[in-house]
Amino acid sequence: GCLGDKCDYNNGCCSGYVCSRTWKWCVLAGP
């Protein structure tokens, strides 16, 4: 998933995004 898509530890995100443990959706990866 990309920005705002739901995710979890077993469901990754698009390149450049990471799964937020807090909100359980994809957010921009930090530096």
Curated annotation (Swiss-Prot):
GO molecular function ontology, one term from the record: ion channel inhibitor activity
User: Which InterPro entries is this protein grouped with?
Assistant: Huwentoxin-1 (IPR011696), Huwentoxin_CS1 (IPR013140)
Q: Does the keyword Membrane apply?
A: no
Keywords, alphabetical: Disulfide bond, Ion channel impairing toxin, Knottin, Secreted, Toxin
Keyword Disulfide bond on entry: yes
Pfam families found in the cross-reference section: Toxin_12 (PF07740)
Could you tell me which cysteines form disulfide bridges?
A: 2-14, 7-19, 13-26
Report the protein's function: Agglutinates erythrocytes.
Family recorded in the similarity comment? Belongs to the neurotoxin 10 (Hwtx-1) family. 51 (Hntx-8) subfamily. Hntx-8 sub-subfamily.
Name the record gives this protein? U2-theraphotoxin-Hhn1a
In its UniProt entry, the species of origin is given as Cyriopagopus hainanus (Chinese bird spider)
